[in-house]
């Protein structure tokens, strides 16, 4: 009604319904409600978004041994496995300890379409392709870890993320914008709705860029969430 969203239409097992609300919060992750309501947005950087991922966990791991290898050693093993016929598109991988004994979380995949282009999370077909390719890639990295990385010899695939991990899609144009410089400078806000110490990540064609704050954090201003 005018510039105010009064509710949303949904489809479920009982058919089509209207859910009315005093306030509507878009928690879709892709700005679906905002865009359908006409809010301005951008899509990635110059139309290019980051690669998706699919995280999984392995158990029965010798965690101390498995996590003792540095990045260069892991990348060398990936190169060796590729020469042997493995399909391992991501070289810079992260193996992280879990609170559970003998378990490691594996953030190692890079999910693309068959032509190498990133997954467009606003398209149902792309999401389906990503789910299929992601789960196949999980199995390939599982096979690689068991064969090449000491500590994983007896490991088993424990579980896989329930859905594709999307790093980037639409960005709604808010009343304010959280910028890279805000993160670099660890800027605080009088209207913060959250604080974060998580790094800037960029997973694209040029490789992986990550920037970590040193014992500091930045705020996410309320205004960045208002279209």
Label for each model-derived stretch:
Residues 2-3, 7, 11-23, 27-227:
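Flavin (FAD/FMN)-binding glycine-rich loop and adjacent Rossmann-like elements that form
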């Amino acid at each position: 009604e005018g510039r105010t969203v009064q509710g949303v239409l949904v489809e479920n097992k009982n058919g089509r319904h209207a859910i009315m609300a005093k306030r509507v919060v878009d928690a879709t992750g892709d700005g679906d409600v905002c865009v359908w309501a006409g809010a301005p947005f951008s899509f990635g950087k110059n139309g290019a978004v980051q690669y998706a991922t699919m995280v999984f966990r392995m158990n029965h791991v010798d965690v101390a041994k498995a996590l003792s290898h540095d990045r260069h050693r892991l990348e060398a093993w990936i190169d060796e496995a590729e020469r042997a016929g493995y399909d391992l598109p991501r070289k810079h991988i992260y193996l992280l300890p879990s609170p559970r004994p003998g378990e490691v979380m594996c953030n190692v995949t890079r999910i693309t379409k068959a032509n190498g282009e990133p997954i467009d999370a606003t398209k149902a077909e792309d999401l389906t392709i990503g789910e299929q390719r992601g789960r196949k890639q999980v199995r390939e990295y599982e096979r690689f870890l068991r064969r090449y990385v000491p500590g994983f010899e007896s490991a088993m695939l424990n579980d896989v993320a329930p859905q594709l991990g999307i790093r980037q899609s639409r960005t709604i144009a808010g009343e304010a914008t959280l910028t890279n410089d805000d993160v670099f400078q660890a800027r605080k806000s009088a209207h913060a709705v959250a604080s974060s110490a998580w790094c800037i990540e960029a997973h694209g064609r040029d490789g992986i860029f990550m920037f970590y704050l040193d014992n500091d954090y930045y705020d996410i201003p309320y205004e960045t969430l208002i279209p």
